[in-house]
């Protein structure tokens, strides 16, 4: 993942106390970038709470549908937490401490700030957690597709 790679570069710069390295400033944009999945749960929730999910005769299909949609819940929670972290970083650190006009070209030493270092570690962690949740969802979707294919072959 490109974002993890860039954050890892920042982290290495901080570990080496290479605060004047221009990469520290140029790569810091990756702290506020977020790519969301936005899973759509409405259809599944309507099926589940109305009892209509039981209309699917095949138990394997019902389970595959449920399992797939249930993998989306952790994604939604992780992405929400990640967004709150980004917003707090923006409001509590970037706005009061960084000149946006110079960001990316300046060698300001905000890399020495513990808030900045903590944010790098936090983002590395949240991105890794998101990746894990996405991978689980992808595997579940593959199983659902396989179940659909098996049903088509038997009908």
Regions of interest found by a model, annotated:
Residues 1-155:
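Long, hydrophobic alpha-helical segments that serve as membrane-spanning/inserting helices
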